[in-house]
Regions:
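Glycine-enriched alpha-helix->loop->beta-strand junction motifs that scaffold or abut catalytic
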Residues: 68-73, 95-98, 116-123, 138-144, ...
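Catalytic beta/alpha-barrel core
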Residues: 51-53, 74-81, 98-107, 120-129, ...
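Glycine-rich phosphate-binding active-site loops on the catalytic face of alpha/beta enzymes
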Residues: 126-132, 166-174, 208-228
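Conserved N-terminal beta1-alpha1 strand-loop-helix module at the mouth
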Residues: 15, 26-112, 116-118, 138, ...
Length: 252
C-alpha cells in the first residue's frame, strides 16, 4: 500500500517520548497536530526548500525574495546569517499562508525556542541532536535534523523527527539515497548540500522526500554582485525540475 508523508508523521508522532497528553498540552510553545501535519503536507507537495546564509543582513531579504519570486514556497534562514530571526519574523508576516518559513543551523533548545518565537514553522539542525528533536516532537514542531549515516537517520526518526536531513548530500548522491530509502522505506530523507540546479529531480526520483538548495541556488557571485535576477532564474529552473517529479508519496 502507498503511504503519504502525513501518515508517516502519525507513525513518527506515536514514537515520541511523552505519554501524557495533559503534560504535553501544558508545554510552552505547543503547536497543534493540525499545524504539524500542515507543515509536513507542504513539504510533501513542494519538495524543495531554499536554504540561505549570507554574509550581510542587507543581502538576505533580497536574495530570499528572489528565490520566492522564482517559485520557492519553503524557505530556511540560517542562524549564521546576521539578523536571522528578524528576517524570519519579517518573511513570516509578509508571506504567511503562502510561503512556509523555517530556521536552520539550530544547535540548542534555546536556539529552537528563539526561532519559534520569531515565527519559524519548522526547525533544522546541521547534526543529529536528540534533545532538540525531542523538544520539538513534544510540542508538535517539525524538526529536520542533519544526519550522515543510515544509523543516524534511523535514530533521528526514532527520536521523533518526521524528516531527516542528509547533510552533506554530496557524500553519496542520488544513488546513496536510493539504496538507503529502499532498505529503510519509513525514512523521509532530505538531502541538502550537493543538490544543484540539475540534479534536484534525480534525488527525488531516487527516493528523497524533499531537497534543500544552498549555494547553487544562491550563487555567491550573483549575490555579491546583487544580481538577484539570476537567483530568481536559478530558482525557477530548480522548481521546474522538481515539479516534473510530482508530490511525495512512498511505499510503506
Amino acid at each position: 500500500p502507498m503511504m503519504s508523508l502525513r501518515f508517516a508523521a502519525t507513525r513518527s508522532m506515536a514514537a515520541r517520548s511523552f505519554s501524557s497528553t495533559t503534560v504535553a498540552s501544558s508545554l510552552d510553545r505547543m503547536q497543534t497536530v493540525e499545524t504539524y501535519n500542515a507543515v509536513l503536507e507542504k513539504f510533501a507537495q513542494i519538495r524543495a526548500c531554499a536554504v540561505l546564509r549570507t554574509a550581510t543582513s542587507e543581502a538576505c531579504p533580497k536574495a530570499m525574495g528572489a528565490a520566492i519570486d522564482g517559485g520557492f514556497k519553503i524557505v530556511e534562514f540560517t542562524l549564521t546569517t546576521p539578523d536571522c530571526l528578524t528576517h524570519v519574523a519579517d518573511f513570516r508576516a509578509k508571506y504567511d499562508g503562502d510561503v512556509m518559513v523555517g530556521c536552520g543551523t539550530i544547535l540548542t533548545i534555546a536556539d529552537a525556542e528563539a526561532a519559534v518565537d520569531a515565527g519559524s514553522e519548522f526547525i533544522i539542525t546541521p547534526v543529529m541532536l536528540p534533545d532538540v528533536i525531542q523538544w520539538c516532537a513534544e510540542r508538535n514542531i517539525v524538526s529536520v535534523p542533519g544526519c550522515q549515516t543510515p544509523t543516524e537517520l534511523v535514530n533521528a526518526y526514532r527520536h521523533g523527527a518526521p524528516l531527516q536531513k542528509l547533510f552533506p548530500g554530496v557524500t553519496g548522491g542520488p544513488g546513496w539515497v536510493k539504496a538507503v530509502s529502499s532498505a529503510l522505506p519509513f525514512l523521509s530523507i532530505n538531502p541538502t548540500s550537493g543538490v544543484d540546479l540539475d540534479n534536484a529531480g534525480d534525488f527525488l526520483r531516487m527516493g528523497a522526500a524533499s531537497v534543500g538548495l544552498v549555494a547553487p541556488l544562491f550563487d555567491p557571485e550573483a549575490i555579491a554582485n546583487e544580481d538577484f535576477d539570476q537567483v530568481a532564474k536559478n530558482a525557477a529552473k530548480v522548481m521546474a525540475n522538481v515539479r516534473e517529479v510530482g508530490p511525495y508519496v512512498r511505499k510503506a
